[in-house]
A protein has these predicted regions:
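Active-site neighborhoods and metal-handling regions in enzymes and metal-associated proteins
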Residues: 1-323
Length: 323
């Protein structure tokens, strides 16, 4: 549990910098990150203080948690998660308690009733820590992405003229689950022909046709971490114009790869691809971002886009690059 202790220590350091003497964690991915227990699904919360860590949940998870939690984490079993969280912090004479602004409004009202004006909204504190992956996280993400690549290679034997987009999506889903993936991180996108221009084109009953390009965008969890892979291929000869579009996007991606390094920001990475695509005459069609971090969630930081100058790349970020 060395990784767990380091993560908690990093959060406690951030709390000190923010002047917080407590932090209530409710976001499911952040709970998993800080507890390393993949089973709560949002049922409970973590209370972090400078001196201790308390996991509050109910009896459904008690046996599994008692067998896996390190001794440094206190376990409280109750259905009144937030009343107990308040008591844990009250015992320590809290003054400023952070909570995640991603919490629902109903949860915010509950916390506000308990903590009053001592409740401090904080955005992205834990998410920022999650952007920098440790060695184990990088290894898992590599396995996750390698499995996705194998899945796409296998799909090529099935994705033929006459098969529908939905059938392609279902085939890939079955293959991924049968070969070790836990679940998809989003509904697999299969968009063929004119629909391949849609950034988020859900699979339909449209049949794949000769001469069309097909875009497949998918991600699957392995050991809690998700891949995010987009591949485009042609059925037969798509024609000169589509070959040019494909080559343009590929070159844009290569130019973005050259920019990505510690210290570069999301706007710089985006511009490396976006400017090239515009120079080739396709700029007006570039209506989406250029990439993002991946990890416990399909969308994490850092982000690549015209508005993301503040997102600076650091060592051990893991990112998609998708112009």
């Amino acid at each position: 549990m060395t990784g767990l202790n380091q993560r908690v220590n990093e959060l406690q350091a951030e709390m000190k910098a923010l002047g917080l003497d407590g932090f209530i964690v409710t976001n499911p991915s952040n709970l998993l990150y800080l507890s390393q227990f993949d089973g709560l699904d949002g049922d409970g919360c973590l209370v972090i203080t400078p001196q201790q860590v308390t996991l509050i949940t109910d009896a459904r998870y008690q046996e599994a948690l008692e067998a896996s939690l390190p001794k440094t984490v206190n376990l409280e079993i109750t259905r009144d998660y937030y009343d107990v969280a308040h008591q844990v912090l009250a015992d320590r004479g809290y003054q400023r308690v952070g909570f995640e602004t991603s919490a629902s409004y109903a949860l915010y009202r509950k916390l506000a009733a308990l903590f009053g004006d001592k409740l401090v909204p904080e955005t992205g504190v834990i998410e920022k820590l999650r952007e920098v992956k440790d060695t184990n996280e990088v290894a898992i993400l590599r396995r996750s992405t390698q499995l996705a690549s194998k899945g796409f290679e296998a799909l090529m034997s099935y994705a033929k003229v006459g098969v529908t987009e939905r059938q392609v999506s279902n085939w890939l889903n079955n293959w991924m689950l049968e070969h070790g993936a836990q679940k998809p991180s989003f509904d697999t996108i299969v968009a063929s022909g004119f629909r391949s221009a849609l950034p988020h084109g859900s699979a339909t009953d449209k049949q794949l046709a000769e001469g069309e390009v097909v875009t497949v965008d998918f991600g699957y969890y392995v050991d809690g971490y998700t891949s995010d892979v987009t591949r485009t291929f042609a059925l037969g000869d798509p024609g000169a114009e589509l070959r040019k579009v494909y080559a343009t996007v590929h070159e844009a991606q290569e130019r973005m790869f050259q920019v990505i390094k510690p210290g570069a920001n999301g706007q710089q990475v985006d511009s490396a691809g976006r400017d090239y695509i515009a120079d080739e005459g396709y700029g007006k069609y570039y209506n989406h971002g250029s990439g993002h971090g991946i990890g416990l969630d399909i969308h994490e930081g850092p982000n690549f886009g015209p508005r993301w100058r503040s997102n600076v790349i650091t060592e051990n970020n893991v990112m998609t690059v998708e112009p």
